[in-house]
Swiss-Prot record:
It is found in: Cytoplasm. The gene is rsmA. The keyword Transferase applies. GO terms for molecular function: 16S rRNA (adenine(1518)-N(6)/adenine(1519)-N(6))-dimethyltransferase activity; RNA binding. This is Ribosomal RNA small subunit methyltransferase A. It comes from the Bacteria. SUPFAM superfamilies: S-adenosyl-L-methionine-dependent methyltransferases. Keywords: Cytoplasm, Methyltransferase, RNA-binding, rRNA processing, S-adenosyl-L-methionine, Transferase. It holds the Pfam family RrnaAD.
């Protein structure tokens, strides 16, 4: 009997229907799949039946030993590779060639892991299970109360879909929250057209206080009178909240702010 290690956020998926739905969500033309946190290898058993090469990253040494024994034939044939490491610490190896990410991500690392994959040019997309609250933030659209910087950063690289919810009863042990599976297909990179790190900081400030007006939040970064000119030109209410502005207008406003910054600091 495996003892669950809370420090790794372990909840093992046991529902066969959910596993099959995850497999069906993976595009057919994927040559290499990276699975993070295979656990007992229940989903891995289905992944190795696909035409793709599979690389698994398992942080738990005890589970790693079990996986080596369980998938001995697949390892010998070269179909499967299992690495005993924290995926975040082995990202260079993980990202050595193009891949599609599949994972039941621990809640405590989910957001950072997804953002890292989104920014990785070798990652062509992902199907991951995460806490529903986080899934909504990634998949929401402008106007939704949950619309966030995560959705905007994702939109720059591709399309995010919330595919389905997963009840806690599908896991052992059952988590205290509802999970959801999202799929991101990366088919563009609009971050190349802007100073990406500056844009991330711009969004961080814009969404720093979701209940306050966007105008007030951004006044900490951009001169208020310049913001008011932009809002008036675009016929925007001065009382709109961060979640109410479209991605296109966020990009336009950021570029205006960058132009203003360069005028104020030509050498910066």
């Amino acid at each position: 009997m495996i003892k669950v290690k809370k420090k790794f956020g372990q909840n093992f998926l046991q529902d066969e229907n959910i596993k099959n739905q995850i497999i069906q969500a993976i595009p057919n033309d994927v040559k290499r799949i990276v699975e993070i946190g295979p656990g007992l290898g229940d989903l891995t058993q289905k992944l190795v039946k696909l035409d793709s090469m599979i690389d698994c990253f398992e942080i738990d040494s005890e589970l790693y030993t079990i996986l080596l024994d369980k998938f001995r034939s697949e390892l010998d044939s070269g179909k499967l590779n299992i690495i005993n490491s924290d995926a975040l610490n082995a990202w260079d190896k993980l990202s050595a060639s193009e891949y599609f990410l599949v994972a039941n991500l621990p809640y405590y690392v989910a957001t950072n892991m997804i953002l890292k994959a989104i920014d990785d040019k070798n990652c062509k997309g992902l199907v991951v299970m995460i806490q529903r609250e986080v899934a909504i933030k990634f998949s929401s659209e402008a106007g939704d109360k949950e619309f966030s910087s995560l959705a905007i950063l994702t939109w720059l690289k591709g399309k995010c879909e919330l595919l389905f919810d997963v009840p806690s009863s599908a896991f052992n042990p059952p988590p205290k929250v509802i999970s959801s599976v999202i799929r991101i297909i990366k088919d563009r990179d609009l971050s190349l057209n802007l100073k990406y790190d500056n844009f991330k900081n711009f969004l961080r400030v814009a969404f720093s206080a979701p209940r306050k007006t966007l105008l007030k939040n951004l006044s900490n970064l951009v001169q208020r009178d310049r913001l008011e000119i932009f809002f008036n030109t675009e016929n925007l209410s001065h009382t709109i909240r961060p979640h109410e502005l479209s991605v296109a207008l966020y990009l336009k406003l950021f570029k205006e702010a960058e132009n203003e910054r360069r005028k104020q600091n030509p050498c910066g």
